[in-house]
Amino acid sequence: MKKQILMAGAAMLALSAGAQTAIPNSGGDNDEQGLIQTVFGIKEKTDKFHLYLNTQTNFNLNWSGEGGTDFDGGRFAFKQLRIEFKGQVNDWISYRYRQRLNKGQSELGYFDNILKSIDIAEVGFRYKKVNFVVGKQCAAYGGIEFDLNPIEVYQYCDMIDYMDNFMTGVRAAWDITPSQQLQFQILDGIALNPGEMYGENITKAKLPFLYTVNWNGNFNNIYSTRWSASFMNEVKNKHMWYFAFGNQFNFTPRCGAWLDVMYSREGIDRKGMITNVVGEQDGHNALNTEYFTLLLHMNYFVHPKWNLFGKVAWERNGVYKSTPDVVKGTYGIDWLYVGGVEYYPLKDRGLHFFLTYVGQRQGHTAKAQAYGLPSHSYTNLLTAGFIWQIPLF
């Protein structure tokens, strides 16, 4: 009994600690011994239960304004803090649960009756080459950066930052070969109350589902793909199409890159970025909006423990068809710049420390300026801290 109390106490203490990197496929399945195992000398670890604390802890200095030179201040923060446990019950049943500990809740409730702070609450069933997953899960969207553990990303591009990623439904994954996989997924497209997402003056869709087909490919560990096409019934008679093409390149064991191409065409503005410019139309979000993103990330390990990385994203947002209130055309051209250095003190490259610069330029065309926005604005961020997916057990 005393040992059980001590183990529970150690887990709670670990939850108050703080941290992993912008390198794909570091999902936590490593051989590092868990904190509870180390403290209590547990010799064997079972695949039926793995417990992690995903954290990104940092100190930030912020500048903003039209020139990006107005100092806004500094602060310490947990940018990401998630508890996660998962396991393999037997050869054909698995489970996974992950919840964000530093995310607020909606007072209006949730369409799928599950807290938005819960990323994943799923059960998987495998039969030969096919795996079926039921519950709240990550959308099977393409893109390399989208597939990363959120703690590994210093700043998302707007396309992903304004996207709903975790929804309830079913997914089937077919391993055609060990290096080629197809996924088919149906999710509740509405996570929050529909009125909160799109405005009150809408007619809800009777089947507001998100349908996605996804291809994950690997070619000799040199070139990998994560491509997808999605269709969603947003509200009655308004639909969304989303395409994402992720391409990862491993040039050498030390040098790699990925290129993500993303396009979203929304009958009613799901992301809300255009609505933030032009305002609501007849009590609902703007209509006929579109978003396009190109993202390039590169990294180079100058030493087994030292990594240099850089990322640039170019994004365009606009309206593809005029309405009586809003004219067709481009409203914004945005740039994102991220670069820095990481230090990995451990061989498994789980824990790492970082010093990172994040710069964002928001450009507004004449169409957006007609709504009172400046031609452009900048934000600059200098951040230092550490990232770690702490293996508690």
Residue ranges with predicted function:
Residues I23-G27, I36-L51, W92-Y95, R126-K129, ...:
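Short loop/turn motifs that connect adjacent beta-strands in outer-membrane beta-barrel proteins
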